Every structure is written in C-alpha cells, then in structure tokens.
C-alpha cells in the first residue's frame, strides 16, 4: 500500500517514515511539508536519518495523493481538514491522529468521509483503544452514585492542546458507559472555591512538562476504594504502528468515518 506522510519533518512524521519501512505491505510514496519548510526538496529518508528513500519532500499534496493509496496525518486541525478534503478528491484512505479539532472541524472531516475512507482517533495505539473499552465497562458497572470518575493526563512541554485527544477519547468511553453526553457532564477546570463535586461529572486534570510522550489514568473513586486504569506511552512508534495498521485495514473499505475501535474489532 502506497502511503503519504504529511508533516513529514515533525516528530510524528519522522516516526511514521521510519516505521513504514518495517511493516510488510506498506511503502512510503510521498512526503508533505508546509510551504516554507526547511525540509522541502530533501529526501524523506535522509531527514529521518535512515538513508535515501528516493522520496522528496514537497509542499504540493494533491499530485502526490493522486498516486497513493492512503495518507497518514498527525498535523494540526486546520491542516487535517484540508488533507481530508484532498483525500476525498483523490478517493484514498485518510488516517488522522490529529487532536484539538473543533466541532466545525469534525463536521468538515465527516463531510469528506462521503468520498474518502477516513480513520480518525485521538490515539492510534492498540493499548489505549483497548483501555477505552475497559473504561466503558468499568463506568457502566460502577455507577455515579458510588464512584466518581477523574481523568489525569500528562504530556511533554510542547503539546499545544488540552485536555489531550486521548483523555477526551477516554472521557467519551466513560460517558458511554454511564449513558450520558460528555459535553454536558465534564469538568475541565477547577480553580478557587468550587463547592462540592457534582454527582456524575467526569473530571479532567492536565499536566505538561519535560519529554513525557503520554501518560493517562482513569480513576474511579469510591468510598474506601479506588480503581485506576492506566496507559503509559514509552515510544511514539506505538502511534505510528497503529496508524499504519489502520491504513492497511481501511484500504479497500467503502468511504466513511471509522475509528480505531473499528480497526481492532472492538466497536460494540
């Protein structure tokens, strides 16, 4: 499967390029960067330190998409909306792990999925997506009258959105387990005199610092006991492997918007 990596010069872009080389059935056929990037014109393999691959980095995505089977996208919300539209024009797979999308961004990506096969997830790792299933089951079994749910996440100092896409993914799983809407039942900030905790609310706490790739814990706190479900990312390659797995799964599927739960057969 011929894959294009967008944001090829970034941390995740370089990880994707390296990881593609180790996965059977996947081949790098294109690499995209923003206009003005210092990586333009350079070989994608040389940029990532793995030697020449014969794929030059360009800022003109559509001709590259037209010759590919899929695109791997961990960029920004605005860029991901654009790439989803271009993937729809080219009728190819679009796998995006971009976080921080607004409701309007999500609607545009959903519209592009009428013509592109799109896999979108706040986290592409296999472990986190299994964790989301466990969180849903735990939230359903341990009701709001007895257990409060708090989600704690920590990432490196360079991360620009909060809570993380993974924290929100886990929050959505908890909300499904409780049969409530996360948007109406989440607490993102606590400061000053807040009063007692509201029954049934799902709280979020965000930490930023150092080089932490991603730590997430879902805490179900009851009277006299706590259940903690956690995931610790130790290498960005887990996200890259998941994204490539998603692309290979989506290749040949009908257009639509899918999640990693679909890819892993965990969607209930």
From Swiss-Prot:
GO cellular component: a single term: cytosol
Pfam families named in the record: DapB_C (PF05173), DapB_N (PF01113)
Annotated CDD domains: DHDPR_N
Pathway(s) served: Amino-acid biosynthesis; L-lysine biosynthesis via DAP pathway; (S)-tetrahydrodipicolinate from L-aspartate: step 4/4
Enzyme class, UniProt record, top EC level: oxidoreductase
Binding residues for NAD(+): 7-12, 33, 97-99, 121-124
Subcellular localization(s) per the UniProt record: Cytoplasm
Annotated HAMAP family: DapB
Protein name in UniProt: 4-hydroxy-tetrahydrodipicolinate reductase
Species this protein is from: Brucella suis biovar 1 (strain 1330)
Upper lineage: Bacteria, Pseudomonadati, Pseudomonadota, Alphaproteobacteria, Hyphomicrobiales
